[in-house]
A protein has these predicted regions:
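GHKL-type ATPase core
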Residues: 1-118
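GHKL/Bergerat-fold ATPase module in large chromosome/replication-associated machines
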Residues: 90-197
């Protein structure tokens, strides 16, 4: 959100939680209003939770804001995949001033996404893995908590490999792809050896 704040002509953030509605407004990256009074807090009758962010790209930062709608759709879909059971709503204003809305939600996250992609014509049922572990990037660095979520299956008709890190799709795979491939190869090798093959 910080990068969006500084690259926006304006950005309005509204958060509903704990029976309140919190609002904060930015222009050109700066908070609108005195620092201590910038955050508006209003009681909310609803048990609503969630966040709404409305912003406009700053034309001094972006020389062209003609971004294809499919890019937004794909980005929202990918966020729904890695944030299970969270609904992302895309609202696009048409030339007539009317808004079209499209929701993206995968209740079981990556598991539902894989099933959507492969359908029912698979060789093996999708296998879902979720684990919390400790890990480190190098020997000289401290350990940290790692949450791993994976889903895989073999299909007769569809091939896909996607990798995500910190809710971001890694178009070119990167280190998480190398780690996943290495771990899968190691696990399959260990299983084959345990079967005496």
């Amino acid at each position: 959100a910080c990068a969006t704040q500084y690259a926006s002509e304006y950005m309005d953030v509204t958060v509903w939680r704990d029976g309140n509605k919190y609002s904060l407004h930015f222009k050109k990256g700066k908070v609108v209003g005195a620092k201590k009074k910038a955050l508006e807090i209003e009681p909310s009758d609803e048990n609503r939770t969630g966040t709404t962010i409305k912003w406009r790209p700053d034309l001094e930062v972006f020389t062209s804001i003609s971004i294809p709608h499919d890019w937004y759709r794909e980005t929202m879909r990918r966020q729904a995949v890695v944030n299970a059971n969270v609904t992302f709503r895309l609202r696009i204003e048409g030339d007539d001033g009317e808004f079209s809305e499209e929701d993206f939600c995968y209740p079981k996250g990556i598991e539902d996404y894989v099933l959507e992609k492969v359908g029912t014509d698979y060789l093996t049922e999708p296998f879902f893995i979720e684990a919390d572990r400790r890990g480190r990037d190098r020997e000289d660095l401290p350990d940290y908590n790692v949450k791993i979520t994976a889903c895989m299956c073999f299909s007769r008709t569809f091939m896909m490999q996607e990798y995500y890190h910190n809710s971001s799709w890694l178009e070119n795979g990167g280190s998480p792809e190398k780690a996943a491939r290495s771990a899968l190869t190691s696990a399959l090798d260990a299983y084959i050896k345990s079967q005496g093959k």
